[in-house]
Amino acid sequence: SKDLMKVIRDEAQNPYISLFRDKFIPSIVNDRPDLIGVSITATSQIIPGLTLCRLIKEAAPDLHITIGGSIFTRLVDNIRRCPSLFDITDDIVVFEGETALLELVNQMAGKKDFSKVPNLIYRQNGKITVNQPFYSENVNQLPAPNWMPCSSSVGTSGAAFNRVGCSVASALMRPERTWSITVEAPP
């Protein structure tokens, strides 16, 4: 974790610093969103994602940054031992984030009781807190994504699939954790 924190600050070796500082940070800071979510789902996204978080926090420490993604789900135990990570983010959502993000937004707008947010890891009074037990979404109760209007260049119908778990065959890809819909494009 110390090496990672060095890399995201290394002006000579990290090409994302100047790119983000010049092209993205000014508009993010000007827009002043209530919540910035950074999803990191592959190891190749760790350095750019954390670099972005660091630059936002340095430019606007009051903006709330939440990190999520499967990388951090796999690193839950390591996150507990990495307090420096919370210098560049306010919290981390592990496992599934639909309910967690909704409750996080509700708490930010209300009592700010982050202990009520499932799957959240955050630092409070210098202590890293991991909200457990971890919550698993019932995918059958989630709304289907709205990809309309469909592009007519791909034909008049197609199938959309969503899978909870990794993108390769594993025990996580049980049939009850998968749903599909058929999408018909308008004529």
Where are these regions (language model features)?
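C-terminal beta-strand edge segments of enzyme domains
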Residues: 132-135, 139-146
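Radical SAM [4Fe-4S] cluster-binding motif and immediate context
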Residues: 140, 147-187
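Glycine-rich beta-alpha loop elements in corrinoid/cobalamin-binding modules
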Residues: 4-135
